[in-house]
Amino acid sequence: MVPPLPLLLLLLLVPQGGHGCQGSELDREIVLAKVRALFLDALGPPAVTGEGGDPGVRRLPRRHALGGFARRGSEPEEEDVSQAILFPASGSRCEDEPAAGELAQEAEQGLFTYMFRPSQHMRSRQVTSAHLWFHTGLDRQGTAASNSSEPLLGLLALSSGGPMAVPVTLGQAPPCWAVLHLAASALPLLTHPVLVLLLRCPLCSCSARPEATPFLVAHTRARPPSGGERTRRSTPPLPWPWSPAALRLLQRPPEEPAAHANCHRAALNISFQELGWDRWIVHPRSFIFHYCHGGCGLSAPPDLPLPVPEVPPTPIQPLSLVPGAQPCCAALPGTMRPLRVRTTSDGGYSFKYEIVPNLLTQHCACI
């Protein structure tokens, strides 16, 4: 018996992507393969640019990159380094009052006291090198004439236990100046809120000129991450990004296992990165793909009224367009919704808005 023509037309309009005649569990790769086929059928293959011919390896310019300014994998990561110059705090110069008399007396003894206040930013970083510039007022001939068993310059740091020696080495410096490079063991001193240095120079005099003010130069870099932060940074990213729709999908109350055996609308969060098209389809980054899945048994749908006691239930027959045909869980004709996407074929210099029709299922039934 040949079915009427309207029934045949309606049968042809039923989407073939319902996945309803599969088993109780549907493999994710099967759904992804179906989604790829639907996109390629609607949009065609992505444009091939470059010698490689792989649209997945094209990179968007930084101004078009989604999710912030991501670094390219081929570029080395730039190290976070900085340089800071510290001048002595007030009261550490010869012209300051009332400390002028005390400093002049110390200068006669060849001892100069300077107080530095490292910033909070510097204290939060790792100091890699530091050197103190001090105006000695001595030319090279005077320095050579003062050579003796006692060193010309010595550096002390004031601590809770009293002054302690700071290991330093003399570096190259212009005339009338001395550069003292702090040893690595003394670098943690610059991570304290207050640093008091005592410089011993028997032949030096205290100068009140602004251009003779000593200063401290420090080079810093970001501290290496701790064990917990390193673990979090090394954790590989999720294969697909989170979205509000995916979060709502996870927050749904759990369903009975039997409900998944019957015909129902299933959902799957799919990202274009997972499909290998994140450089072709740039928006949205992910979407919830709804499809029909499950068997078409004779159990009553959950929205039907409960049976009356002592009254035999009436068997529920599934909707079938063709008499004698096996019903299949599929989307109702006319209820499919499209998906709007934004694509690029030149690495992000131009965009195209396209529509994938009949992609998202709204209602499922046994047909």
From Swiss-Prot:
* Entry-listed glycosylation sites: N147, N269
Top-rank lineage group of the source organism: Eukaryota
Q: Which InterPro entries match?
A: Cystine-knot_cytokine, Inhibin_asu, TGF-b_C, TGF-beta-rel, TGFb_CS
Disulphide bridges: C263-C329, C292-C364, C296-C366
Q: Which SUPFAM superfamilies match?
A: Cystine-knot cytokines (SSF57501)
* Gene Ontology molecular-function annotations: cytokine activity; growth factor activity; hormone activity
Q: Name the Gene3D superfamilies on file.
A: Cystine-knot cytokines
Gene Ontology cellular-component annotations: extracellular space
Q: Name one Pfam family in it.
A: TGF_beta
Going by the UniProt record, its keywords in alphabetical order are: Cleavage on pair of basic residues, Disulfide bond, Glycoprotein, Growth factor, Hormone, Secreted, Signal
Which is a GO BP term held by this UniProt record? hemoglobin biosynthetic process
Assembly mode: Dimeric, linked by one or more disulfide bonds. Activin B is a dimer of alpha and beta-B. Inhibin A is a dimer of alpha and beta-A. Inhibin B is a dimer of alpha and beta-B. Interacts with TGFBR3L; this interaction regulates female fertility.
Q: Which family does it belong to?
A: Belongs to the TGF-beta family.
**Function, please?**
Inhibins and activins inhibit and activate, respectively, the secretion of follitropin by the pituitary gland. Inhibins/activins are involved in regulating a number of diverse functions such as hypothalamic and pituitary hormone secretion, gonadal hormone secretion, germ cell development and maturation, erythroid differentiation, insulin secretion, nerve cell survival, embryonic axial development or bone growth, depending on their subunit composition. Inhibins appear to oppose the functions of activins.
What is the name of this protein? Inhibin alpha chain
Q: Give the organism, scientific name.
A: Equus caballus
Question: What lineage does UniProt assign to this protein's organism?
Answer: Eukaryota, Metazoa, Chordata, Craniata, Vertebrata
